[in-house]
Amino acid sequence: MQAIYDIPEILFQHGVTDVVLSPGSRCAPLSIAFSRHKKLQIKVVPDERSAAFIALGMSLQTQKPTVLICTSGSALYNYAPAIVEAYYQRVPLIVLSADRPPEWIDQNDGQTIRQQEIYGKHSKAFFQLSAEHELPDTQWETYRKVNEAVSISEAYPKGPVHINIPFREPFYPKGEIMFSGSPTVIKREQPLHTLSDEQWKSIQHKLDSYKKILFVGGQHLYDESLRLKIGNIKAPFIGEVVSNLHGVRNVIHTHDTLLTSIPLTDLEELKPDLVISFGGALLSKWLKQFIRSNESIDHWYVGPDVTTPDVFQHLCQIIPVQLNEFLSKTTIASNTQEQFVQRWIQQQTHIIPAIREFNTKEKVFNEFTAVFDVLNHLPAFAKLHLANSMSVRYANTLGISQRNAEVFANRGTSGIDGVISTAYGYALKTSQLVTIITGDLAFFYDRNAFWNNYKPSNLRVVLLNNHGGGIFRMIDGPSALPELDELFETKQTLSARYLATEHGLEYTLCKNLNGLNQALESFFQPSMFGKILEIETDSVKNTEVFKRFKKTIQQSYLS
């Protein structure tokens, strides 16, 4: 077992310090070895699905791999939603799964399934270790594969890796276990993506042929140096809420409302001849349709990605460098381009006060206005997590006023599962305030996020409880069907009050605007416990208000 007992030290030497394990018998050698390593921080989370998302949140904060440890059988499958999200969101995770000896697979033995390559192509790499841990060659193999797994997880694009480890009985150590102190550690320097001077000259020559260039940012971590550089570029940048470009001078964050509201003649003036995209997944359906429907638009992607999705169906150039380098090496300047920037900014200048005026005058208590108020109360340097469905879309429509806020969302796969656990894990790794805005289905789906012994007092949960999946009332298809309530909206009558009591969280319920404003005065203040702010609304009224908002913005162009 010496090779197994040395795995924690190898990972520590690579800078890995965080471990989330779920209790089990077959994984005992791993659990004991990691828990007895004095320099690792161990969190024990019983629910494997929640554990994996908590690990995802921790890695989002640290930008280092978090280790996941589980027993054999279905436990490993429960990691799958978070592994897929980590793969597409490019978050490093290292899964260590215990397994039965290979000869016992498919022999009707308990907790025994086919675990090899269980995550398929959603894991960056899979490594199968031997069950014969005492052999010298096996020790060498273990050291080599663990080192390789860490390097692959951290190589761009970052992502999850899986190491499957079979154990024979007996696997519980008797007495102390011995750490060798000097296991083999293999470091790998990450390559730099660079282009030659001739390539940059060619890129600049092509760039000069375009007169109206529009940058589009997908999901991207907050990067102050990039934000400063973007602010000095003479081009409009469309920044979604998850692009973390809010507050930058030439960034357009009202594109969703803008593209569905302005007259067609004005829309034509906003059409670029080149779109340069960067970052991950895009949220806006209308932005995608706007670019896809204009066949004359060319599309470049900037980023050192292995694969580049042709999201606009116009991709013609891939530049495999980070955007910072691209902006440093190229120049975008022309009178036409300056006019193009101003057209976009003028349209946004019209939209922003209209959004503010609508929400300050709205008398019906609803989710959209509630999110507007919550976002306006966010403290400086807020860490904001957004659940999928309407929460992230409301925020994308409204924009973030706090320039230094960092925004996160599980947009890798855009599922509702694990959003509370992700924010929970992030909160465990920072002393700063972490806020999650979530709908009721995502909240109750992931209620086991709170089922552990770690209670971050810096966690703030804003629960938009309309007692169902409100997004389905916003969509033309399901909203017109008689099965809307039962098959799509999934009406429920739950409240977070008892969950808050059970897990020691401060709880406030708001059913009107005055109650919300009063609650927000103290909600973000420091406290000994985490807090839940439950905002109860009616889904029918929410839909009516949001549709009225869109109509109001459209009419503002006619007045």
Curated annotation (Swiss-Prot):
Co-factor(s): Mg(2+); Mn(2+); thiamine diphosphate
Sorted alphabetically, the Gene Ontology BP terms of this entry are: menaquinone biosynthetic process
CDD domains for the chain:
TPP_PYR_MenD (cd07037), TPP_SHCHC_synthase (cd02009)
What pathway, per the record?
Quinol/quinone metabolism; 1,4-dihydroxy-2-naphthoate biosynthesis; 1,4-dihydroxy-2-naphthoate from chorismate: step 2/7; Quinol/quinone metabolism; menaquinone biosynthesis
The record's keywords, sorted A to Z, are: Magnesium, Manganese, Menaquinone biosynthesis, Metal-binding, Thiamine pyrophosphate, Transferase
Cofactor: binding comment: Binds 1 thiamine pyrophosphate per subunit.
Enzymatic reactions: isochorismate + 2-oxoglutarate + H(+) = 5-enolpyruvoyl-6-hydroxy-2-succinyl-cyclohex-3-ene-1-carboxylate + CO2
InterPro entries to which the protein is assigned, alphabetical: MenaQ_synth_MenD (IPR004433), MenD_middle (IPR032264), THDP-binding (IPR029061), Thiamin_PyroP_enz_TPP-bd_dom (IPR012001)
Q: Which HAMAP family would you find in this protein's record?
A: MenD
State the oligomer form and interacting partners.
Homodimer.
Q: What is the protein's given name?
A: 2-succinyl-5-enolpyruvyl-6-hydroxy-3-cyclohexene-1-carboxylate synthase
**Taxonomic source organism:** Cytophaga hutchinsonii (strain ATCC 33406 / DSM 1761 / CIP 103989 / NBRC 15051 / NCIMB 9469 / D465)
